[in-house]
């Protein structure tokens, strides 16, 4: 599995021959990539705020993985998409898309947007992406990446996502103000019991400017064994 960070919460994930793009927003200071250089098979949207769907219109006709509310908003405003299941998915569900299995879990955040469902974008979420189907009855080897979306610290990270979905790596927001800051994000990494942790959603605009070393130090302070990788924009990590 290859993970490429394009700044903010935008990630490109390659699972065998399937390319996924999460929260496309290339108008951020971390990346020089032209969004039209990418040709994902599926776009995954954690929620409908502008800094997470800002470039989704570049991928009209692409497969779309999001809640029904966000799917309808994208169709109403950006054109036609091939929504997974015809109308999207929802929290707790797992879908098989190409070579990847994607489970959507809730995130503690807001999601205000005007949709045909009303003045709400539904619950925001995060994605657990794996190369094998999640199960409790097999010891098959798997590689699993958790994109937490915009969120605060949740006990579900400790009680559900970590022990049952068993991510090897997690990208967590650390910018504070709108999401977790370095201290809470470090606790999330510890609770998730991952081998690799990546900070995201920081240094995009003034309210979320931080020192990433604070996050590194906080992870160490929890006693976690996770390796923290502060990627440069457009950098790829092989998981």
Curated annotation (Swiss-Prot):
Pfam family, one: Lactamase_B_3
Coiled coil: none
InterPro entries (alphabetical): RibonucZ/Hydroxyglut_hydro (IPR036866), UPF0173 (IPR022877), UPF0173_UPF0282_UlaG_hydrolase (IPR050114)
Keyword annotations: Hydrolase
GO MF, one example: hydrolase activity
Family: Belongs to the UPF0173 family.
HAMAP family: UPF0173
Name of this chain's protein: UPF0173 metal-dependent hydrolase rrnAC0300
UniProt organism field: Haloarcula marismortui (strain ATCC 43049 / DSM 3752 / JCM 8966 / VKM B-1809)
């Amino acid at each position: 599995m290859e993970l490429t960070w394009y700044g903010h919460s935008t990630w490109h994930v390659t699972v065998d021959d399937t390319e996924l793009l999460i929260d496309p927003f290339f108008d951020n200071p971390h990346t020089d990539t032209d969004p039209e250089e990418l040709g994902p098979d599926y776009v995954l949207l954690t929620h409908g705020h502008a800094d997470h769907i800002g470039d989704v219109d570049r991928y009209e006709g692409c497969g779309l993985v999001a809640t029904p509310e966000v799917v309808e908003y994208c169709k109403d405003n950006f054109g036609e998409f091939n929504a997974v299941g015809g109308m999207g998915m929802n929290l707790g569900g797992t879908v098989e898309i190409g070579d990847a299995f994607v489970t959507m879990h809730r995130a503690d955040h807001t999601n205000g947007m005007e949709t045909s469902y009303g003045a709400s974008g539904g619950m925001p979420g995060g994605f657990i992406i794996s190369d094998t189907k999640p199960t409790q009855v097999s010891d098959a080897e798997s590689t699993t990446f958790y994109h937490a979306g915009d969120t605060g610290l949740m006990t579900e990270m400790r009680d559900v996502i970590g022990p049952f979905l068993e991510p090897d790596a997690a990208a967590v927001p650390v910018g504070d103000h709108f999401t977790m800051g370095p201290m809470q994000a470090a606790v999330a990494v510890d609770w998730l019991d991952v081998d690799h942790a990546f900070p995201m959603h920081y240094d995009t605009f003034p309210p979320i400017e931080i020192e990433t070393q604070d996050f590194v130090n906080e992870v160490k302070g929890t006693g976690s064994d996770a390796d923290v990788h502060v990627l440069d924009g457009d950098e790829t990590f092989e998981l």
